[in-house]
From Swiss-Prot:
Keywords assigned: Calcium, Copper, Lipid-binding, Metal-binding, Methylation, Phosphoprotein, Repeat, Secreted, Zinc
Top-rank taxon: Eukaryota
Binding locations of Ca(2+) 2: 13
Lineage: Eukaryota, Metazoa, Chordata, Craniata, Vertebrata
Phosphothreonine, modified sites: 62, 64
Up-regulation conditions: Up-regulated by fat diet.
Family recorded in the similarity comment: Belongs to the ALB/AFP/VDB family.
Residues where Phosphoserine is found: 5, 61
InterPro entries: Serum_albumin-like
Entry's localization field: Secreted
Record function comment: Binds water, Ca(2+), Na(+), K(+), fatty acids, hormones, bilirubin and drugs. Its main function is the regulation of the colloidal osmotic pressure of blood. Major zinc transporter in plasma, typically binds about 80% of all plasma zinc. Major calcium and magnesium transporter in plasma, binds approximately 45% of circulating calcium and magnesium in plasma. Potentially has more than two calcium-binding sites and might additionally bind calcium in a non-specific manner. The shared binding site between zinc and calcium suggests a crosstalk between zinc and calcium transport in the blood.
Species for this entry: Capra hircus
Protein name: Albumin
Binding residues for Ca(2+) 1: 6
Amino acid sequence: DTHKSEIAHRFNDLGRHPEYAVSVLLRHLVDEPQNLIKKHGEYGFQNALIVRXXXKAPQVSTPTLVEISRKQTALVELLKLVASTQAALA
C-alpha cells in the first residue's frame, strides 16, 4: 500500500487523479496474464508459470510449483471476473 500511495502521490503532483494513475500503471499486470491464458489456455499458462518459477527457484519442489501455478491461474481468472463486473457496473 505504501508503494501504491507513493505512485499515486507522484501522479497527483502532475495533476492527474491518483486512482486513475495507479490503475493505468498496474493494468498490464492484469492484461498480460489474461492474454496468455487466452492464447495458450489454462494448461499452457500453468506450464509457463512452472517453467519460469523452476528457473528462478530450482530448490522448490515440483508439486509446490504446480500448486502455485494453479493458484496464480485462479487469481487471474478472479481478476478477469472483477474487471468484467466493474465494466458492467460502470
